[in-house]
Structures are given as structure tokens and as C-alpha cells.
């Protein structure tokens, strides 16, 4: 399938980031790809292009740029930036990006989903809880911790996941150094409690960041194993008609 792509700038386009889409006029599902703490890296742009070839209009918003953080690369700055920027600020610009995607002429706004990595996965949980229109949620090792609510992170995923109204897929590894066994257990229970279709994929030898080449945890063999599961889930949630 022939695709097109474009780098977006907030002052010109309304959002910052990268968009890829099939070069045809038909309306199609839309996917928002939310980045990890390292920001919009090259592999996420490749993911957008791969999804476009599968028929999805795909937007990778640069959340840092949309919040006024300058720089072409944010690799290694994630911890610092998450101490400066609170979740409500992140959620505001995620909402801006989702509306930008859903309002595109080539997107069916009733068929939108999210793929999110690490920090993006953690932030996607409150966003999905607040956005019942969302049709699919795929979380690669969301960086959820068992921590108290603070001004930076005022709402916890354990509570919010119970209210999500769309099918969800979570992918974790047993060697994840951020979300330990008890955190993963509580998150599993919370997603299971929301009553929506839910897939949990766990790999005992996988590390946090296994799908990101810029992460110390990168495991390309794991990324290759998981990707077909992700695309199959998206097809069932966003392309196939809902069951009666």
C-alpha cells in the first residue's frame, strides 16, 4: 500500500509530531502512538509507517514539544521532564493530539485506538478512562509504580483502569525494573475488573523497553514476537465490525 507521511509543527499544524497514512481518500481507523520517556524516536516513526501500510492513519505526537520543551532529541531526559511536567499537562496535549487525529477527513472518529510505550502507557490509562470513545488500547510495559498520588501524578492507574470502556492489551516482561510483580498483579486485577475484553501478554525473560532500540532493555527478538499480536488485536478492535 502506498503511504504518505509528514512532520508536524504545532505553530503550523496545531500539533507537533509525525503522521503517516495510506495515500487514498477512504476513511479508515486512526491510531495514536504515544512515546516513552525518550520522546519521539526513529523507531516510533517506523511504527507509524508500518501501521499506515496496514491501513491506519497514525499520529505520533511529540508531547514534549507540545508542552514547550525544545530540542530535537529528548533521549535520557525523561526522568527530569516528568519531574517538571505533571500528568494533567500531559493529558491535555494527548487530548489535543487525539482530537487532531479523530477530526482528520480520512479518519473514522468512531474507530480510534492507542499504542503506547512506558511513560506513554502510564499516561494512556487516565486518558482512556476519560475518553470512552476510544476503541482500543495497547500498552507496552506501562511505567506504573505502586506510589501515592501527588500533584505531579494525581490519579493512580490502579483505580482508573477499572473504569476503561474499550478492549485493552497489556504487555509486560518478568525482568521489568519499573513495574514489579505486585504492581503488575494489581494492574491486571484492575483491568480485569472493568468488564471489557482484555489481553495480558507476559514474557518472563523480557525487559522494560524491549521494543525500543534506544533503551538499555532492547530485545529485538521480543519486539518481533509481540508485533503480530499487536496488529491482530488492532484489527479485531478497530477494523472488524463489533459483535452483535
Residue ranges of model-derived segments:
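Short beta-strand/loop motif that positions the catalytic acidic residue
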Residues: 164, 170-172, 176
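C-terminal catalytic histidine-bearing segment of alpha/beta-hydrolase fold enzymes
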Residues: 192-244
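A short beta-to-alpha transition loop/helix N-cap that caps and shapes the active-site region
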Residues: 67-71, 144-150, 178
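Conserved alpha/beta-hydrolase "acid-adjacent" motif
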Residues: 177-183
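Serine-hydrolase catalytic machinery in alpha/beta-hydrolase-like enzymes
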Residues: 5-107, 154, 209-214
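Alpha/beta-hydrolase-fold catalytic nucleophile elbow
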Residues: 62, 115-117, 138-141, 171, ...
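Primarily recognizes the serine-hydrolase "nucleophile elbow" in alpha/beta-hydrolase
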Residues: 96-155, 159, 163
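Alpha/beta-hydrolase fold active-site loops
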Residues: 29, 111, 167
Amino acid at each position: 500500500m502506498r503511504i504518505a507521511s509528514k512532520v508536524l509543527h504545532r505553530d503550523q499544524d496545531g500539533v507537533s509530531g509525525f503522521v503517516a497514512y495510506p495515500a487514498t481518500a477512504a476513511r479508515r481507523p486512526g491510531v495514536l502512538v504515544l512515546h516513552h520517556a525518550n520522546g519521539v524516536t526513529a523507531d516510533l516513526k517506523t511504527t507509524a509507517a508500518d501501521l499506515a501500510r496496514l491501513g491506519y492513519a497514525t499520529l505520533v505526537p511529540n508531547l514534549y514539544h507540545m508542552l514547550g520543551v525544545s530540542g530535537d532529541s529528548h533521549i535520557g531526559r525523561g526522568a527530569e521532564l516528568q519531574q517538571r511536567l505533571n500528568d494533567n499537562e500531559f493529558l491535555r496535549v494527548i487530548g489535543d493530539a487525539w482530537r487532531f487525529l479523530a477530526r482528520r477527513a480520512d479518519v473514522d472518529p468512531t474507530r480510534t485506538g492507542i499504542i503506547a510505550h512506558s511513560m506513554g502507557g502510564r499516561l494512556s490509562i487516565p486518558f482512556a478512562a476519560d475518553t470512552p470513545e476510544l476503541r482500543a488500547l495497547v500498552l507496552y510495559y506501562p511505567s506504573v509504580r505502586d506510589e501515592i498520588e501527588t500533584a505531579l501524578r494525581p490519579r493512580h492507574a490502579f483505580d482508573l483502569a477499572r473504569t476503561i470502556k474499550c478492549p485493552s492489551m497489556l504487555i509486560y516482561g518478568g525482568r521489568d525494573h519499573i513495574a514489579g510483580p505486585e504492581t503488575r498483579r494489581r494492574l491486571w486485577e484492575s483491568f480485569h475488573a472493568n468488564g471489557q475484553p482484555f489481553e495480558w501478554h507476559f514474557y518472563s525473560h523480557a525487559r522494560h523497553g524491549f521494543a525500543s532500540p534506544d533503551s538499555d532493555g532492547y530485545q529485538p527478538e521480543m519486539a518481533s514476537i509481540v508485533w503480530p499480536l499487536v496488529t491482530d488485536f488492532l484489527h479485531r478492535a478497530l477494523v472488524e465490525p463489533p459483535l452483535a
